[in-house]
Amino acid sequence: MKQPLIELKNIERYHTNGDTLTTVLKSINLKIYSGEMVAIVGASGSGKSTLMNIIGALDVPNSGEYFIYGRNIADLSGDELAELRCRHFGFVFQRYHLLSHLTAVKNVEVPAIYAMADKILRNQRANALLCQLGLEKQLENKPAQLSGGQQQRVSIARALMNGGDIILADEPTGALDSQSSQDVLKILKDLNRKGHTVILITHDLAIAEHADRVICIQDGKIVSDTANALESMIKPQNKRTFIDDAVIEVCQQHNTEKLNRPNEKNNIDNDNKENNNGYNRNDNSFLNNPKKKLNSSILRSFNSYAESFFMAFNMMMAHKIRTFLTMLGIIIGIIAVVFVIALGEGTKKKVLDEFSSLGNNTIDIFPGKWGDESDNVHTLNMEDLELLYQQPYVQRATPVLLHIAKARYLNKTMRSLINGVSHDFFMLKNYQLVTGRLFDQNDLTLSQPVGVIDKKSAKLLFDMDDPINKIIFIDDIPLSIIGVVESSSLQQNSGKEILIWIPHSTMATRILNQSYIQQISVQLQPNVSPLKSDKAIIDLLTIKHGQKDFYTFSSSRFLQSLNKTTQALTLMISSIAFISLIVGGIGIMNIMLVSVIERTKEIGIRIAVGAKERDIRFQFLIESTMVSLIGGCIGVGCALLFGGLFSLAETSIKIQFTLSSFLIAFLCSSMIGIVFGYFPARNAAKLRPVDALSRE
């Protein structure tokens, strides 16, 4: 006995609203065989559309059994149901349900996208279907540019895209004029004569008379099931596919993916052999074309992802202003994060460079304790300096004696800071000689009245004159300027005070007449630990003095502390800037949630033509991620632009962009797109197709 293509046993469907139970379908028993054209007729509210939704796997019954190709639909997973809709069902809706932002060809291609068909072949097939339906001049028209009859033909072509073994037509002529209605009915009858099973849902008995069987449904029950003898008599016996030979040439070697499990009998193939004289009406061989190398799961998945990106981009372009306003929060947040990090890096680099110019790997030793008045504490002397010179971890050392005095040149008198140092001081502090010479050991030994001045001080004291060999007076003591050095901004005194360096022996004997020194600066060997050396110096001088009557200042330790401080400051400011990214992310989630509501019908259409939950979820996730990433790219570009403008301004701080700031920006924008886009995407994927299609 021939197995029915579709069999419903005791199907019931009801809805609950609080304590109220509304029964829509009652004990439906129905068999539909392959190749039949069946009309289900009923008034509005009779349950005919609910029955169609159950047959088309858009809805599930509350009780009863539904078999298709011999398999109970209750045993199928969500993905298997999607595969069933994708490869075996074709829907023709009363309101066409075309995607408004796609052309006629692209609308027809949608089912094949979810079947992961080759792009070129599916485009060829979509064009051929539309041409066969008389729409060769409207291939690139969007739905708004088509008449009602033309839109319904596009809907029929979409139903046939993956083969359309079973065509479900819900009031296909309800929104058409009489001529267009006759054309659509002729197409459906022609499809049935050539092998497709057609199930026609209508309220009009005149429309139903075109079918082989007329099933009347009233108040959720089948009240009659009669054959149309005339239609059965005129149906030809030799069936061929709807697509002509030109399309068949493109779509050869059918290899339809089987619905049944491998260990079950393939009723689809058997049924095809019985009814098509060796030719399969499910002409979807383009889904598995052996000439193409895209059959591997990896490449086909890649194609699917590429299509998701393309569809997401199309949706963004369809709502340009809304998309831009959505990504504006991300743009501002990325600008803030990148610019703040770059500003922090630039500030840190400037400060570290300035402090590095004071001397690398140095330790300064001061008398007394931190906070003491150094003028009243005299615990350091030249013996301490000589002792430090003997230590293996010390590369060079210099005493420092300080004195504030009036410097006079001709009729110009200025406040000056006099530093008594050794010849090692200039190398230790990274001073660069501009002109003249530095004093040497001979000058130290003979306590020569010579001095070195910095470039800024030379300009203040001598104006444009060459300072070399000029005589100045320090407290009426003559001093010959022998050299000019370049110092960093941290080494320069502010205001009108000038800096002069003289031999420490000259300072001690000619100016101060003292034996003690106010500071010792030590530069360590390159490969020693500053921390251990600092401890060794403290232990050494503590033993010599009998007590710790001094304190040290390590440049390396200070730079480490400064680096940590600037990093913490940058992190704090970046955290504040990151808040704007969070706000932008919330904006994306809000817009995507609204988008899900606005596009509910589109989601229903995509599910009806074969989209799986993961396809819908991935598409919306891609949209939110693309909005975030594009916003991130624009934000980075704006940050670079602002950084360039900032650098052109006369500021002492330079912007320092780093690769890490760009990576952080793109990581943040990607994560925001994924995190804040996930919940709207999940909501979209969880929509029931029958609910989605019913919303306006």
Curated annotation (Swiss-Prot):
InterPro entries linked to this entry: AAA+_ATPase, ABC3_permease_C, ABC_transporter-like_ATP-bd, ABC_transporter-like_CS, MacB-like_ATP-bd, MacB_PCD, Macrolide_Exporter_MacB, P-loop_NTPase
SMART domains: AAA (SM00382)
Species of origin: Haemophilus ducreyi (strain 35000HP / ATCC 700724)
GO molecular function: ATP binding; ATP hydrolysis activity; transmembrane transporter activity
One family name in Pfam for this protein: ABC_tran
Residues annotated as transmembrane: 324-344, 576-596, 626-646, 659-679
Family: Belongs to the ABC transporter superfamily. Macrolide exporter (TC 3.A.1.122) family.
Keywords in alphabetical order: Antibiotic resistance, ATP-binding, Cell inner membrane, Cell membrane, Membrane, Nucleotide-binding, Translocase, Transmembrane, Transmembrane helix, Transport
UniProt-listed GO biological process terms: response to antibiotic
Name of the molecule in the record: Macrolide export ATP-binding/permease protein MacB
Bias kind Low complexity: ranges: 275-284
Topology of this chain in the membrane: Multi-pass membrane protein
Function: Part of the tripartite efflux system MacAB-TolC. MacB is a non-canonical ABC transporter that contains transmembrane domains (TMD), which form a pore in the inner membrane, and an ATP-binding domain (NBD), which is responsible for energy generation. Confers resistance against macrolides.
Region (Disordered): 254-287
Cellular localization per UniProt: Cell inner membrane
Signal peptide, first to last residue: none
Complexes and interactors: Homodimer. Part of the tripartite efflux system MacAB-TolC, which is composed of an inner membrane transporter, MacB, a periplasmic membrane fusion protein, MacA, and an outer membrane component, TolC. The complex forms a large protein conduit and can translocate molecules across both the inner and outer membranes. Interacts with MacA.
Basic and acidic residues biased stretches: 255-274
Record-annotated ABC transporter domain positions: 6-244
Binding-site residues for ATP, renumbered to this chain: 42-49
Name of the coding gene: macB
GO cellular component, one term: plasma membrane
Cross-referenced PROSITE patterns: ABC_TRANSPORTER_1, ABC_TRANSPORTER_2, MACB
EC numbers for this chain: 7.6.2.-
